[in-house]
């Protein structure tokens, strides 16, 4: 693999009902409106617990109501939905051979998930999952396995046997970077590259997507690496709405790296601090729907959300503020209308709901929260309309 200088990644997702175990149906919500969404929440939980929960969330009032829960998956810590929301894919984040990827169907009328099938990831601790642009493959980033698994999908959306992409190398941090640690997989907005963030080797592995029918999804021979600063620890990435810039959060150095993206090439144009306390626990990153503000979460010290304004000319960032949160904000999500930012606080067992000022980008705690054990992934899915 040839090496470039730069960086990248992003992500998106949603979810579904039913299970290997059982799905419980709570109260129904009548007459869905354009203000109502499904909020799908992944968590750290035992298989016999409802590790995935479905809520109805009103993005005008900022209030959520429990709809249903799904058991049967151990540690469903990350979810991704199909574009139409009818299918959801979830990791089963165990560290050994029991690690899985799971296919679910989602009944948007009832707000219920049901289990389709499961496949082993052949790599421990899968922590991120994504769908290919044509929604004919699912890929997992396996943190302890140090690899990526590529699953073809069958006609029902079921997972077929997966194939692995194996990586080598290490980084300067002997405790955190003794081997490859894949933390995020996602496709560029134009669908031409798969980007795999490797926290263990300070690289983004980039794979062109094959364009010819009958070929494998990825052109492995044309793959290359984007090399980052030693000890950075790349974690998650998001793209601007126009697809011209990417924003990468590094877990260990606590930076947001701004990259330009053009013709399958990434170039670093700015590095700015999100974690000023050297907590080495930066986690998630998202951009507002209007593209004007970037938000990044920090854990371990000074738990909260760093807020940056975006320069509309060149995509660079300027610090705009900081919002304290509950403990261990591993993941967060912004409502499609941009009015609210929801934070999954793993160690305070709650989803905090913040109102977002569209002019300043700043957040205000509404006092509303959803109590749930160890929430770590939030995805919105539109409700079906009658």
Where are these regions (language model features)?
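Short loop/turn segments immediately following beta-strands, especially the blade-tip
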Residues: 56-62, 104-112, 150-160, 207-217, ...
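Short loop/turn segments immediately following the C-termini of beta-strands
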Residues: 44-46, 93-95, 143, 153, ...
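Beta-rich, blade/repeat-based domains predominating
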Residues: 48, 73-84, 122-133, 137, ...
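Bacterial Sec-dependent N-terminal signal peptides
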Residues: 1-36
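A short beta-strand motif characteristic of beta-propeller blades
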Residues: 65-71, 114-120, 163, 169-176, ...
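An edge-strand/N-cap motif at the start of beta-rich repeat modules
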Residues: 24-58
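Blade-loop segments of beta-propeller domains
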Residues: 65-135
């Amino acid at each position: 693999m040839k090496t470039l200088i730069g960086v990248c990644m992003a992500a998106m997702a949603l979810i579904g009902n039913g299970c290997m175990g059982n799905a419980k149906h709570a109260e129904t919500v009548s007459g869905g409106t354009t203000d109502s969404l499904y909020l799908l929440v992944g968590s750290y939980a035992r298989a016999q617990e409802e590790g995935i929960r479905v809520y109805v969330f009103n993005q005008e009032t900022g209030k959520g109501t429990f709809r249903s829960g799904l058991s049967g998956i151990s540690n469903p810590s990350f979810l991704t939905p199909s574009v139409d929301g009818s299918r959801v894919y979830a990791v089963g984040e165990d560290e050994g051979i029991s690690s899985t990827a799971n296919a679910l169907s989602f009944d948007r009328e009832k707000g219920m998930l049901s289990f389709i099938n499961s496949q082993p990831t052949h790599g421990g601790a899968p922590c991120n999952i994504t769908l290919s642009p044509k929604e004919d493959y699912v890929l997992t980033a396996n943190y302890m396995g140090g690899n990526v698994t590529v699953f073809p999908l069958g006609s029902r959306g079921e997972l077929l046997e997966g194939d692995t992409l194996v990586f080598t190398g290490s980084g300067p941090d002997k405790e955190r970077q003794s081997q490859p640690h894949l933390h995020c997989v996602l496709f560029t907005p134009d669908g031409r590259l798969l980007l795999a963030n490797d926290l263990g080797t300070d690289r983004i592995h980039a794979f062109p997507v094959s364009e010819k029918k009958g070929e494998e999804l990825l052109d492995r021979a044309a793959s290359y690496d984007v090399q980052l600063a030693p000890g950075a620890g790349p974690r998650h990435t998001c793209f601007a709405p126009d697809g011209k810039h990417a924003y990468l959060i590094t877990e260990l150095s606590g930076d947001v790296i701004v990259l330009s993206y053009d013709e399958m090439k990434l170039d670093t144009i700015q590095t700015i601090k999100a974690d000023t306390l050297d907590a080495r626990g930066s986690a998630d990153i998202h951009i507002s729907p209007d593209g004007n503000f970037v938000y990044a979460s920090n854990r371990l010290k000074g738990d909260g959300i760093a807020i940056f304004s975006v320069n509309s000319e060149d995509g660079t960032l300027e610090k705009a503020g900081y919002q304290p949160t509950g403990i261990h904000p591993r993941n967060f999500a912004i409502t499609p209308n941009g009015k609210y930012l929801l934070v999954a606080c793993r160690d305070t067992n709650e989803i905090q709901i913040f109102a977002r000022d569209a002019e300043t980008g700043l957040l205000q705690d509404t006092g509303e929260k959803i109590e749930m054990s160890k929430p770590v992934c939030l995805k919105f899915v539109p409700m079906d309309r009658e």
